[in-house]
Each structure stands twice: as C-alpha cells, then as structure tokens.
Amino acid sequence: MMNSSQFSDSQTTSLHRIPTFYCCYLLQSINKKQSFYIGSTPNPVRRLRQHNGNLSNGGAYRTKREGTRPWEMVLVVYGFTSKIAALQFEHAWQHGYKTHYIPMDDRIMKNANSGRTVHHKLGLVRQLLANVYFRHMNLKVHFFSMPILDVWNLNKFNIKMGSNEISVDVSQVSQETKTNLEQASDDDDDNGACSRDERNLQLVTELYDNTVTKENEIKEIIKDILVLGERNCNLCGQCYDYTSEDDTMKMHIFICPNSTCHYEAHLNCLYEKFIEEESGIDSKNILLPNFCMCPGCLDEMSWSDFVKISTMIKNSFSN
C-alpha cells in the first residue's frame, strides 16, 4: 500500500491505479475432487473458460491433464492493490512451506509434498490474510461452493486471525441452496458435470460483472461532481479543479460515492486526519490507517478504498 508521501501531485510519471478487479483463485476438478489449482487473474471469467478449454488460447498445463476437466472456481481472494501484490499472494499460496509471509513455526505445510488437501489450501489463505502486508489491502474472500465454505468455517488448523476482520461472502445462489453446484456431481454422466461447470461460470460472471459495474457507477457519480469545476477540500479548504488546464489543480482527492454524502477532501488531508486519530488511541507509530470512516456520512471504509477511489479519479479525469 501507499502512504501519504507517495501522493505528490507534482509527479509527472505514470500513476499507479488500483485494478478494478484482480484476484487469486482456487480451482477444483469436478471429476477428481482432490485435484486443485491455484492461479491469479484480472478476469476470472476468461481465465476459467481458458482452463476448461472453452477458449483456444491460455489455460495451464496442469488443468489440461486427462480426466481433470471440467474445473470449477470454488473461491477467489480479490481486492489486490496491484498485479504484483496478487502475484506475491499467488506464489505464497502455492509455496506455503517456504513463503516468508508465514513464520516458519506457524507453517501448516512443512515441505513441497505436503499440504495437498483443501483444508491446507484454505488454511494458507487464512495465514496469508493475517500477514500485515496483505491485511492492509482489505482483501475479500468470495466462495462459489457451500462445501468449500463449510471447510473454511471448520478451520481445521484453528488459525487465529487476530483482530483482523476478513470480508467473507458467498454467491447468493449458493445461499439459497446448499446443493446448488453439488447436485450435478451426483450424476456420473458428462451432462451432469457440464451443467455444474456452466452454473459455476455463471456465478463467477456475476461477481466479476457486479464489481466492474459498481466501479463504473462510482465513476459516473464522481464525474457529475468534477465537471462543476472549482471545488474545495472539506478539511483544509484548498481549491482543486479537474476542469482546469493547470495540472497542479488536479490533486489526489477523495469523493465519497454515497449518494447522500459526496464528502470531498485531499487524500493527504484524510491520511493525516486518520493517522492522528489512531495515534491518539494507540501510542505506537502507525504508517497506514486501520480504521477509517468517511467524515461526511460516517460509513466505514478501508484505507485501500480511499486510495482506490482517489487513484481512479486521478487516472480517469486528469487528462
């Protein structure tokens, strides 16, 4: 994550933008239950189709092995602040026995040949999410399979998350029936497996499309405010103007997307406010805010949410 000093508005270099969607995912073979695959992608719909051979290009050698197709995407971890961060999580997830993100004494995988069960796969996710590096990204875990969610809730290795609250969700269709994706697996014919594969793709598509749609809606809300011209930071009062030809007026700002709020302030001002508030509670030196609320509507948001909206504004509307 970035801190206040990294949001210099005099920068002329290419600006980093937090991706709309970037995830790490876990695949499970429908026909071979003990076969799993871990990967990462900015587009889980396209990637799942590649793994299942629906697209001619892409996929992975391991997911092409005889008898393993079709695959279903049983969970995704998403909300990464960059492609690099997602790749780091993916590599650590694949190599839990040696990753520096998990202390050696706490590792549930002891060597390269261990940790092949789904309990280990999900246990590693818990351990990685507890690491301070990933914790500040406010990552979310989304399940497309109720049995896999049940394994998560079982928490076989009793992994403690500390005070870190992880956003865990499950596709709505899965909530309506615990056998939504599993019913077809009771049938031994190919049609049953195919039906389950297609249903899973629908669930993945819904999550991805909803995330993209939500960001586009936020863009439109913010655009309607920015076109009004000169605006003022609600904290320091300094002007900014995204309609100006003067790039120095196009500072890193945050605008609350809440339809009843639209609080606006410089990202630096918000950073200083949140750090000061948390420093008053905890005497330790704090580099990144942990608990943030929009000063206008008091909606709880993570610091990464503030940064994501601010960098989206800077990248989308500064030209």
From Swiss-Prot:
It is found in: Nucleus. Residues 20-103 form the GIY-YIG domain. Forms a heterodimer with SLX4. Belongs to the SLX1 family. One of its GO terms (biological process) is DNA-templated DNA replication. InterPro entries: GIY-YIG_endonuc, GIY-YIG_endonuc_sf, Slx1, SLX1_C, SLX1_endonuclease, Znf_RING/FYVE/PHD. Its main location: nucleus. The keyword Nucleus applies. GO terms for molecular function: 5'-flap endonuclease activity; crossover junction DNA endonuclease activity; zinc ion binding. A zinc finger (SLX1-type) spans 233-297. Its cofactor is a divalent metal cation. It holds the Pfam family GIY-YIG. Catalytic subunit of the SLX1-SLX4 structure-specific endonuclease that resolves DNA secondary structures generated during DNA repair and recombination. Has endonuclease activity towards branched DNA substrates, introducing single-strand cuts in duplex DNA close to junctions with ss-DNA. Gene3D superfamilies: GIY-YIG endonuclease, Zinc/RING finger domain, C3HC4 (zinc finger). This is Structure-specific endonuclease subunit SLX1. It comes from Vanderwaltozyma polyspora (strain ATCC 22028 / DSM 70294 / BCRC 21397 / CBS 2163 / NBRC 10782 / NRRL Y-8283 / UCD 57-17). The gene is SLX1. Its EC number is 3.1.-.-. GO terms for cellular component: Slx1-Slx4 complex. It comes from the Eukaryota. Keywords: DNA damage, DNA recombination, DNA repair, Endonuclease, Hydrolase, Metal-binding, Nuclease, Nucleus, Zinc, Zinc-finger.
